[in-house]
């Protein structure tokens, strides 16, 4: 029987933290921490005979993700608005650092053929197209007003965001940006944390969409991981590489920003590369 693992709260916290940043995927962090396959299988199995082991695996991860989103939403609003370039350079370093781990676990040197490399290219292209779809202001002021059409929009946005969240390289928060609701959702989270529940209906609409997206997309991903593993990993590698296009904030504008951005980029790269090596050694 699957046991409740306290360490998974920390792993969930890391996943939740990454999902606050447009362009950075919680699925990427799950891969880096070595829990991606089990995470997908557990979500897929929550409405099956594997309910209890799936439930006990997911609960600490969900707790960690909620803690991260509740405690860090204001911080990330500040970092992304006031220190956008260094923040995104840090996450760019994290993303690049995971690529060697992905190449290693996919055993690409002996397993990949032309079709797999074409799938990598397709994954990169998909991320570039998704990035170009977003032309809105990531940090524009938002209100908490609601209408029937907006509730439907938030539900669909949540559904697409959770589906993206499960795929390494595609950020759930970035999909919220594509739908133009990222600022509103972040504001709603911040207000609910302050015990102002005016944003609760928005979070409920998004939350139900997230739940529906998790259930549907996890079963699809689980199927492809089981029956088309190499092609799936090739697509994932493409998504991760393509996500660099999404997180690239532009070049620093002065010497100090260049220095800070390069330092945090290197830190992110080293952290990701080290975690990838540790995970690979423990598999």
UniProtKB/Swiss-Prot annotation:
Subcellular location: Cell membrane
Notes on activation and inhibition: Active in alkaline conditions.
Keywords tagged on the record: Cell membrane, Cell wall biogenesis/degradation, Membrane, Transmembrane, Transmembrane helix, Transport
UniProt superkingdom: Bacteria
Record keyword Plastid present: no
Disruption phenotype: Mutant shows an alkaline growth defect, reduced peptidoglycan quantity, accumulation of the peptidoglycan precursor UDP-N-acetylmuramyl pentapeptide (UDP-M5) and decreased cross-linking. UndP recycling is impaired and mutant shows increased cell surface UndP levels. Deletion of the gene increases sensitivity to the amphomycin derivative MX2401, which binds UndP in the outer leaflet of the cytoplasmic membrane and prevents its recycling. Mutant is far more sensitive to amphomycin than the wild type in alkaline conditions, and is also moderately sensitized to tunicamycin and bacitracin.
GO biological process: cell wall organization
Record's bilayer topology term: Multi-pass membrane protein
Extra remark: Is sufficient for resistance to a surface UndP-targeting antibiotic.
Family: Belongs to the PopT family.
Name of the protein: Polyprenyl-phosphate transporter
Organism per entry: Staphylococcus aureus (strain NCTC 8325 / PS 47)
């Amino acid at each position: 029987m699957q046991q409740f693992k306290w360490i998974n709260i920390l792993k969930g916290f890391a996943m939740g933290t990454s999902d606050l940043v447009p362009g950075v995927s919680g699925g990427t962090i799950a891969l880096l921490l070595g829990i991606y396959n089990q995470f997908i299988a557990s979500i897929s199995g929550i409405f099956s005979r594997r309910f209890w082991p799936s439930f006990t695996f997911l609960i600490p991860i969900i707790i960690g993700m909620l803690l991260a989103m509740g405690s860090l939403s204001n911080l990330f609003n500040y970092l992304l608005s006031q220190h956008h370039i260094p923040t995104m350079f840090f996450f760019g370093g994290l993303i690049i650092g995971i690529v060697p781990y992905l190449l290693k676990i996919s055993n690409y040197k002996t397993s990949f053929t032309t079709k797999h490399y074409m799938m990598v290219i397709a994954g990169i292209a998909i991320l570039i197209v998704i990035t170009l779809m977003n032309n809105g202001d990531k940090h524009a002021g938002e209100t908490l007003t609601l209408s029937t059409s907006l509730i439907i929009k938030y539900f669909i946005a949540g559904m697409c965001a959770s589906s993206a969240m499960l795929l390494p390289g595609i950020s759930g928060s970035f999909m919220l940006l594509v739908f133009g609701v990222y600022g509103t959702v972040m504001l709603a989270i911040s207000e609910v944390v302050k015990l102002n529940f005016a944003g609760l209906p928005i979070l409920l609409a998004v939350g139900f969409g997230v739940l529906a997206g998790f259930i549907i997309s996890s079963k699809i991903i689980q199927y492809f991981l089981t029956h088309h593993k190499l092609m799936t990993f090739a697509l994932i590698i493409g998504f991760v590489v393509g996500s660099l296009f999404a997180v690239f904030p532009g070049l620093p504008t002065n010497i100090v920003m260049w220095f800070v951005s390069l330092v945090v980029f290197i830190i992110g790269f080293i952290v990701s590369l080290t975690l990838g090596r540790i995970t690979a050694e423990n598999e």
